[in-house]
């Protein structure tokens, strides 16, 4: 396993087991550590986790960030690692990045997995996300509110170590908070380009938790109907971070 920085100072971890690598893209405000349950379960596969621009150990100094910036980040990382083909897994903002990547670099993808993605938000849904973004701009702590949306109360009671990990990840110093806001702004104001989405022909699996209030089952079903070569699986009893709370169910589908 290599844990290192590429020439562009992107932090990554690469476990090379000789298979087509599975690349994981985390969500806004998080980092590569959110995928621990998947990496442990997929220990016989080649896997890559990395920190997005302005997240975790990867720096970012520009005033704004775009999906194109994030897609180019991944292209450059793959070029550095000399990898031509991947399976790509994106969560939340990561799924929007994964779709953008797929629309531009389908030749690099074997399969695409979108987890907890948003799609065709209603005006009410959009305003709720923008309200949370505006709270974040005022430096109001969102950590505990976010965890209530992402996990069930019962799970966090049984797994205090998960609670502690995500409080640590979400508790930003001022410079990290500024970069967090850049990505949060992108996520909150995102509008789907349906014409581009309909051109993606990569075999795609879409998953979301049955109790995910922000990235709903209805959104995922709608996306699946617009993606030509896709299927949808509802993760029973899962909230937004069903990849952790319902890791066994998610991992079985990743392996399949």
Which residue stretches match the model-derived regions?
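Catalytic histidine-centered segment of alpha/beta-hydrolase-like enzymes
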Residues: 238-251
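Conserved acidic catalytic loop of the alpha/beta-hydrolase fold
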Residues: 69-86
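Gly/Ala-rich beta-loop-alpha elbow adjacent to hydrolase catalytic centers
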Residues: 90-94, 98
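Conserved alpha/beta-hydrolase catalytic His-Asp/Glu region
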Residues: 123-125, 140-198
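Flexible "cap/lid" loop of the alpha/beta hydrolase fold
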Residues: 99-104, 109-140
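Short beta-strand/loop motif that positions the catalytic acidic residue
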Residues: 200, 206-208
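Conserved HGGG/HGGXW glycine-rich cap/lid loop of the alpha/beta-hydrolase fold
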Residues: 10, 14-59, 63, 77
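Acidic catalytic loop of the alpha/beta-hydrolase fold
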Residues: 210-215
